[in-house]
């Protein structure tokens, strides 16, 4: 199903969620190749951009081959958020997303991320300022609420809509849940029924069947896949194919997994240098090989790998053993 944000018409309505330490440029490219309709960058601190932090350049980088990309900012100062949105709006981004759902303590303790769900008035100031400052669409991602005593996703979505936000993405857990328990898809349904702007559902989409159920049970306009895409960029092709045809494509073969890991490693090496790439591939390898025989041994061995050549040799040895 097509999806439109601002003037950008997406190929489909299946999104790659922003994930710190995961959705860098190489991984977004792989997910786009596998059919993601749109991806979102790792979250970027507006203050860090303001103060010209050296790491922000890498976080803000995109490639034309990625297709539509949204850049995700976090912060709680309306003036800074608006100024940075204006500063980057001429960049190659289809939209500017605002993180109001991150549950990490260092973000929350700084009154950012999901902390803003406890302060809707401040969140409203941030969104209003950003919408006024730019022509590009502003979207916002948030949670069910801060905790079970303050479930306010519906009110929060209405507030965002009144500010002129183009779309909202809702994760069906509270901040206190982090990623434990089960995502509450009914809150996504409630948000969808309460606003006229597009609603993107997020939380516990790990299979094509999950994606279809979310659409059917919530009526949401789009699906955002986060943890389900870790080590599994194929999920986008499998979801879109299933939604379009009802046919369930098989998962990747061992050789396809091996080839994807190698491509990922090569792309990371070109982008970040071999030492950093091999260090980051340790996490990705754990995700790619989850469920395989001897995966624990493989994860242990990858920690010793320091070169792309070493990665290729390890994969050859271990995949043959499988």
What do these predicted ranges mean?
Residues 14-18, 39-41, 69-73, 96, ...:
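Hydrophobic faces of well-ordered beta-strands that scaffold small-molecule active sites
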